[in-house]
Amino acid sequence: MKTFHIFITGLCLATAVSCSQQQNSAEDGGNAVIENIMSRRSIRSYKDCTVGRDTLQTILECGINAPNGMNKQSWEVRVVDDPAVMDEIIDLMEAGNPDAKPGSVKGCFRGAPVMSFIANDPSYDCSPIDCGLLSENIMLSGWSLGLGSVCLGSPVRFLNNAPEA
């Protein structure tokens, strides 16, 4: 138990020193990370344009470099940027949700030029946390490159329950 308390005290001291140094640079307007985090918003209306492969690759690399428990990288990421495939996914989701209003499923994606789907490993209890960290890195790196995003939970119910998904 002593080791634990000493470690916590050491961590608190290191954090306090680190925070005071970071705070000064943020006051000077020089902390791009804090500015990026504080300015990011969910975007629900997209321009009719494509996102370049190099840009997508950079964003995904930022995502998979997120911290994760025991470096298990307990996720799978799928990226869809083909409008025909996106329409197929939307059609499957609408067919799997007969109570949905016509067009409401397509509306939830709001014309986004790219969709990314992140799956976690259900056998690892920290995987949902790891996937959340990955998602946050994706959204923040996209924002820093001038791309907006929105995190959607509603498609998850369909994707987890439909065999054709």
Segments and roles (model prediction):
Residues C19-A165:
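Acidic, surface-exposed loops and disordered segments
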Residues F7-A16:
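Bacterial N-terminal signal peptides
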